[in-house]
């Protein structure tokens, strides 16, 4: 913001260094390091202050845009430490004490002030914002969510707030990036690099979870339930890991030597398996096959890429063989699931919950029964919603929509899905494929779980939608200018 008023060459040179830093891998890695430290040591509050200073305050005064918000948005969900989780008392987080909430509201006010100030400044400089069809999609989705359970006894402010919160989880990062990031200056691979950074953050946190229970691994009592962080259990961590799979494939196609990124993709795939989430594993297997087919169709280095994949596969197999006793103890439940695979095992006794969702839908097919109607089999206490904010759910996004919001909510979701996919089909590019795969991941992980209603997936999803929209607008503009120049010549 102060860039245009500075005349000193030395100071201008320093500010240009700051701008390059925010677009570099070093910034992404630094935010990732802060995130891991927060999750391991319980340093959420100081890390949040650093997030706001680095992502909002400094860029407000010294940067061309606020690309600095992409990494903190993407990693912020992973900061909550297990130290602040009431593991012995059931679901609930002790992080949000009254003292912490005072700091949190200060931080929210500060970052909101930075965002609004930047938006006004950019607008006065002449920046114009083009309307997006996603804006209408978000509005319709929000309206259908807040009417979920209308005319039923469970309908109330808690259900309304939860519905708005779901839409806000991807609308806030979407609009923040949409209004504050200059996508014409953003390198096309920037978001992919952020997703790779997210992959490393998740791997570090999963490894910490394993090492925290190393005694259980050695004595054979380790289970997938021990793969948990302060912000989620194995299903949450596994789902977020799946979101990182497309990025290395995109980067492999963008670089002349794709072999490093192929290795990263396989590492992220293996890490998804290590999370021991059956839902995430299923989506990862299907998604990985689709990604590799896409890669081999597009790449010029098919033979070398195949050799690279075989090398990493053999490396993983050799490591598993060398440490077979340890591996069998760590993944006993996952190995058993693979050996005895069936839909019933995959669903993990959720059919009663699914039937409950269908029964609720039948009782109120138009507006549903609200988000706070408790599913059978969850075992949530009466005050579950008030103590944990997020209500018990049906482990299936689409049944959740029918049960909680009825036909109206399903229509709102389908319209939202339509407008999110339209930009992809308008002149496909490699960047659009990346964001399209991110949307497919959200659809996939939501089949046997409710990740569409979770904050972390919502943030990545919202940023992917924003990038898809902006890339489409830039692509249309470039093709129009090319056609115009061609016609003039």
Regions found by a protein language model. Give the residues of each.
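Alpha-helical transmembrane segments of multi-pass inner-membrane proteins
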Residues: 146-149, 171-172, 189-217, 231-297, ...
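Flexible juxtamembrane loops connecting transmembrane helices in multi-pass membrane enzymes
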Residues: 222-228, 306, 320-356, 376-379
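Aromatic-anchored transmembrane helix interface
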Residues: 104-109, 133-146, 155-179
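N-terminal signal-anchor transmembrane segment
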Residues: 2-7, 14-119, 147-149, 442
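Loop-to-helix entry and N-terminal half of a specific, functionally important transmembrane alpha helix
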Residues: 195, 260, 264, 392, ...
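Long extracytoplasmic/lumenal interhelical loops at the membrane interface
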Residues: 341-405
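Transmembrane alpha-helices of multi-pass inner-membrane enzymes
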Residues: 30-34, 55, 246, 416, ...
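Hydrophobic transmembrane alpha-helices and their immediate junctions
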Residues: 301-302, 308, 404-443, 478
